[in-house]
Amino acid sequence: MPEQKAPQDLQLILDDIYRELTPRLGEGKVADYIPQLARVNPQHFGMAIVTTGGEVHRVGDAEVPFSIQSISKVFTLTLALGKHGENIWHRVGREPSGSAFNSIVQLEHEGGKPRNPFINAGAITISDLILAGHTPKELIGEIVRFVRYLADDENIVIDHEVARSETVTGFRNFALASFMRSFGRLDHPVEHVLGVYFHHCALAMTCSQLAKAGLFLAAGGTNPLTGHSVVSRQRARRINALMLTCGHYDGSGDFAYRVGLPGKSGVGGGIMAVAPGKASIAVWSPGLNENGNSLLGSLALEMLAARTGWSVFGP
């Protein structure tokens, strides 16, 4: 059985991964259907690890903010579970979709109930759920405050240019939301729900901030650096389970096979991954693979899991 790596070894592992991937920087295809994301330099690469013992390790562009996009769905799901508990599962499923993240076909076939909270239709439903009793502006503010609380960092903001860019070009998301509204699956006006959705997807964070924000999922629901209790141990375990099975769109099975860690990707090129009991990891490389997941980010996490023995399926 491979020996578990001590924290002091993690920086060496990160440095090695960065050095080995440097010749491949720029590989993959930057998301071009959101104009602001299409302008991002594909040569960027950053990675950060925050251990449950408080060690912070980073490499490359780990302090450069980027658009976290669908990674934000982990945070809105956590908020929804806090507000509504297990009742949310009447509105959204817990199964992998096997289809593209913005597919309408499956939604029609299944009566407007999204397969899981991490595909676009599912996250739009979650936005509708947590909008109850709020104006869109109030809820957007609450989401930002919640993510700042998780990361213990008041500098996290929404990139309003990205939010505006998505609002102008997000025709497929308008179609998904309108479709669910036609099935009686949304309680609020489509424009209000999507206003929330586009803005939380436009959160800008660094790898270091993102790794800190996900640390509660690695430590049984409580951030060990701040003492902030976020969710119960059982709920943290269940969020991790959903990230493992559904966190990478229709590439989730391959990510579980290669990396073996709960994780959530975004088309901005970021991935937040969790090694339960050990660490939270964030990686950013804008070039995407055919499933819309970071090509080099996925490879970096595969290398990290292999060298640390952190896969949840065993070293």
Swiss-Prot record:
Disulfide bonds: none annotated. The keyword Hydrolase applies. Keywords: Hydrolase. Substrate binds at residues 70, 120, 166, 173, 197, 249, 267. Pfam families: Glutaminase (PF04960). GO terms for molecular function: glutaminase activity. GO terms for biological process: glutamate biosynthetic process; glutamine catabolic process. It catalyses: L-glutamine + H2O = L-glutamate + NH4(+). Its EC number is 3.5.1.2. The keyword Hydrolase applies. SUPFAM superfamilies: beta-lactamase/transpeptidase-like. Belongs to the glutaminase family. Homotetramer. HAMAP family: Glutaminase. This is Glutaminase. It comes from Sinorhizobium fredii (strain NBRC 101917 / NGR234). The lineage of its organism: Bacteria, Pseudomonadati, Pseudomonadota, Alphaproteobacteria, Hyphomicrobiales. The gene is glsA.
